Amino acid sequence: DVCDSLVEGRCIHNGCWCDEEAPHGNCCDTAGCTAWWWCPGTKFD
């Protein structure tokens, strides 16, 4: 698993992620969020 320290140290695999406070903005859509950016990796672990 690849953990991105820029995203509160949370593990991401497919870039599926949703957090307005993330440095990259709303990275992905896992529960209805708008994907503004794709986080590195391939899916939330």
From Swiss-Prot:
Disulfide bonds join 3-16, 11-28, 18-33, 27-39. It comes from Californiconus californicus (California cone). The modification 6'-bromotryptophan is found at residues 17, 37-38. One of its GO terms (cellular component) is extracellular region. The lineage of its organism: Eukaryota, Metazoa, Spiralia, Lophotrochozoa, Mollusca. This is Mu-conotoxin-like Cal 12.1.1c. Mu-conotoxins block voltage-gated sodium channels. This toxin reversibly blocks voltage-gated sodium channel in cephalopods, with no alteration in the voltage dependence of sodium conductance or on the kinetics of inactivation. The cysteine framework is XII (C-C-C-C-CC-C-C). It comes from the Eukaryota. Expressed by the venom duct.
